[in-house]
């Protein structure tokens, strides 16, 4: 459960990302594909090379979904319901991949905003990504 302080940390951290959210989403995807190559199996139709338009496009989708979630921290299940259905029933993404992408997002954000990435912000963002992952996998059952 996200505390009031977590919600503040998340909103402030995401606010500092500003117009770079899509760029950071793509960078996190590239990092995931490189570090965890088995994740590429869910994107056989993608050019997963550095800087590809498809990775950039999907990175923007990831970032937009997270931006939506940040705007609905009190109702993540409602905000992410359609995405949960998509990933569980159509795409059938292995739930472990959400954790892998979450880790890559944390690394990407820490790399771009080291001064703002305090232990408290790190913990809050980690809880947020874990909450998003839980919601996205909730309809697998």
From Swiss-Prot:
Entry-linked CDD domains: Hb-alpha-like
GO biological process: hydrogen peroxide catabolic process
Gene Ontology molecular function terms on file: haptoglobin binding; heme binding; iron ion binding; organic acid binding; oxygen binding; oxygen carrier activity; peroxidase activity
Gene name tied to this protein: HBA
Protein name: Hemoglobin subunit alpha
Residues bearing PTM N6-acetyllysine: 16
Residues modified to Phosphoserine: 3, 49, 102, 124, 131, 138
Modification Phosphotyrosine, positions: 24
Tissues/organs with expression: Red blood cells.
Binding-site residues, O2: 58
Entry's family note: Belongs to the globin family.
PANTHER family membership: HEMOGLOBIN FAMILY MEMBER, HEMOGLOBIN SUBUNIT ALPHA
SUPFAM superfamilies xrefs: Globin-like (SSF46458)
Residues at which heme b binds: 87
UniProt KW keywords: Acetylation, Heme, Iron, Metal-binding, Oxygen transport, Phosphoprotein, Transport
Role: Involved in oxygen transport from the lung to the various peripheral tissues.
Chain positions with N6-succinyllysine modification: 7, 16, 40
Classification via Pfam families: Globin
Subunit structure: Heterotetramer of two alpha chains and two beta chains.
Residues modified as Phosphothreonine: 8, 108, 134, 137
GO cellular component: blood microparticle; haptoglobin-hemoglobin complex; hemoglobin complex
Domain Globin: residue ranges: 1-141
């Amino acid at each position: 459960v996200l505390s009031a302080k977590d919600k503040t940390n998340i909103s402030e951290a995401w606010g500092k990302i500003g117009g770079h959210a899509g760029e950071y989403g793509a960078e996190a995807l590239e990092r995931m594909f490189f570090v965890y190559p088995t994740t590429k199996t869910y994107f056989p139709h993608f050019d997963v090379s550095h800087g590809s338009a498809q990775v950039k496009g999907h990175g923007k989708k990831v970032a937009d979904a997270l931006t939506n979630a940040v705007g609905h921290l009190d109702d993540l299940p409602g905000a992410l319901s359609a995405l949960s259905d998509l990933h569980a029933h159509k795409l059938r993404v292995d739930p472990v991949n959400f954790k892998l992408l979450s880790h890559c997002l944390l690394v990407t954000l820490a790399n771009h905003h080291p001064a703002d990435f305090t232990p408290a912000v790190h913990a809050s963002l980690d809880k947020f990504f874990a909450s998003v992952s839980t919601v996205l996998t909730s309809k697998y059952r």
